[in-house]
């Protein structure tokens, strides 16, 4: 059970010493408060404590954490898909490009361009 201390100052008696109030985190939602000293003006005391925060902190920190986690998930998704594609062999796919690269594209692709003629070599001995 975690507790923290809150400084309380009487509303009408600012010259009185500050009272220490101990508030239990488990009872915070019910606003239960335990004072370690009793004064005549205890009913009119103003108690101030830091705003109620979750484990992540303020709203700005939650927003930054959400943005960072979304960015991280997107990066891992991108990198994972790239690694998956690079580890796969082209022979595992059977699309038209892979068939053409394996040399059997002329069977399935009637619009294949004929091979270009070879350039004449000047070292062939003919003039």
From Swiss-Prot:
Q: Tell me what happens on changing residue 74 to T.
A: In strain: Dahl salt-resistant
Q: Residue ranges, Cytoplasmic compartment?
A: 89-127
- Mind telling me which residue stretches traverse the membrane in this protein? 70-88
Q: Which GO terms describe its molecular function?
A: angiotensin type II receptor activity; endothelin receptor activity; vascular endothelial growth factor binding
What does the function comment of this entry state?
A: In the Dahl salt-resistant strain, acts as a dual receptor for both endothelin-1 and the signal sequence of vascular endothelial growth factor A and does not act as a receptor for angiotensin-2. Does not bind the VEGFA mature protein. In the Dahl salt-sensitive strain, acts as a dual endothelin-1/angiotensin-2 receptor that is functionally coupled to a calcium-mobilizing transduction system, responding equivalently to both endothelin-1/EDN1 and angiotensin-2 peptides in a highly specific manner. May play a role in angiogenesis with a significant role in cardiovascular and neural development.
> One of this protein's GO BP terms?
endothelin receptor signaling pathway
Q: Which GO terms describe its cellular component?
A: plasma membrane
Instruction: State the compartments where it is located.
Output: Cell membrane
User: Membrane side Extracellular: which residues?
Assistant: 1-69
What is the originating organism of this protein? Answer: Rattus norvegicus (Rat)
Q: How does it sit in the membrane?
A: Single-pass membrane protein
What keywords are annotated for this sequence in UniProt?
Answer: Cell membrane, Membrane, Transmembrane, Transmembrane helix
**Domain of life here?**
Eukaryota
Q: Under which name does UniProt file this protein?
A: Dual endothelin-1/VEGF signal peptide receptor
Q: In which tissues is it expressed?
A: Prominently expressed in brain and heart tissues. Weakly expressed in aorta, adrenal gland, and lung tissues.
